[in-house]
Amino acid sequence: MIWIALSFLFFTVMVAVISAWKTRDDKLDTAEGYFLAGRGLPGIVIAGSLLLTNLSAEQLVGTNGQGWASNMSPIGWEVGALFTLFALALWFLPTYLKMGTTTIPQLMEARFGRGTKLMFSFVIVVMYSILNLPVILYSGAVVFENIFDISGIFGISKFTAVAILCVVIGIIGGCYAIFGGLKAVAVSDTINGIGLIIGGLMIPFLALALLGHETTGGGLVEGVKYLVQAEPEKLNAWASWDAAEPALPWPLIFTGMFFNNLYWWCTNQSFVQRALAAKSLKEGQKGAIYCGFLKTIGFFYLVLPGVIAYHLPSIQDKLAAAGSSAIDFAYPALVSAVVPKPVMGFFAAVLFGAILSSFNSVLNSASTMFTLDLYRTAINPKASDMQCVKVGKIYGTCAGAVAICVAPFVMFAQGITTFLNSMSQFVSLPILFTVLGALIFRKAPKYAPKVITAVHVIAYGAFMIIKPCYPTSGEPIHYLYAIAVLFVVEFAIMWYLNKYRGTEEYVPADVGAVDLTPWKYRHIVCIIGIILAIGIYILFSPIGIAA
């Protein structure tokens, strides 16, 4: 127990010390220095920060749970991100950096006017502050509690354990985001990302070795053989078109999921802000493309362990006892069974770092958007950089404090995570098409985003209320089918407005913020990534190991 605590503290403190050292000479009293790390992030740091912004503890448990409950089809969330990260690198980022974009709403204002900027800024800041932050804290605390049994160790109730964890995570994460700015967040993300890859990849290898030992008396190789031969359909990444959640129907890989990923990876502020802080277009493209490769191998620690847990004999009693909640306990049970005690402290620190990264990334983005898109636009247009940094710190402190107070009580709001995911879809495509107005639909009138938003909210709201079902199975239709249909409809509307109601063509201004020379190897590396993704889907298919 002492060794676990010491190794946990060592890694956690090491991350904090390195982050403080790397930001010791930064100018955090300017808006660009505080909110965009002085536009000085290299590609490797951008890649690590993008990865950790996306990867939450809830995702680690939830996606593995999906693999346990269905098959390998949830790898679509990981492998599919490769293509949208390439889109960010090749098409979105050059325009963002050319315009000197700090926040996505700033681009919206340049293209469609102040009203559009304020509308989306207000909605996004409210969602980040009221919904995302408390849920990130709560879900992270619950995952940590489920894996490491904090309540059992200290003899306290689960609610108390979750509340304490929320306070600890909130305070530490808030310190990174509020006092260190974006660079401190990005540096800590990079170190935690390295730890996560090491710790995360350790789990399937240990699990396969234990599977081989428990089933045949062998080791790792026997575990792999058993996994492939025992139930091959569990290794199939191609779910039927009418598969129920948590499986991912195969048509959505190319439609709804791709469009959803375009929003998250290419237009969502908490993700894109890391790339906007690049020291050059070359480094920004490297970061996005590197992250694409990291996401492609993500299924090794985000889906495969769940499939292994389905087969591992020693944890089946625990999962059976969990009943309907077994999907959320598959990964914690596997970790408890396979991670050696001397390594558990390191793994706990890695998981703690992933939770911190999710929280401080969203907190930093909420603070950035509130300050630059609401305060400086609507409240105090003449605010100096120093005033903006001060307001950003005050808002970040208040938002963090509210999240800490609210987070433990999310326990009593059933289905809050599903509700949060559903709410994000109400703004995903409208934001995406507003940004596309600066990239593709350059003649669309200024009222176009409002038309798209109205159509999307009404149509998606109707889908959520009616909850249509598949005619074949009677199961609810996957929400990404609705996103796929709405993307086509809204694209057609935007095309019509651009073609027949268009105004003078918009030309993005070049403000000379950074060097816009692209990475010369970007195309060949992207082609290699696409070949890798195709190879993975062939491997996990009926013509591969899922025969």
Please identify what each model-predicted range represents.
Residues L196, A448-Y460:
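Central hydrophobic cores of alpha-helical transmembrane segments
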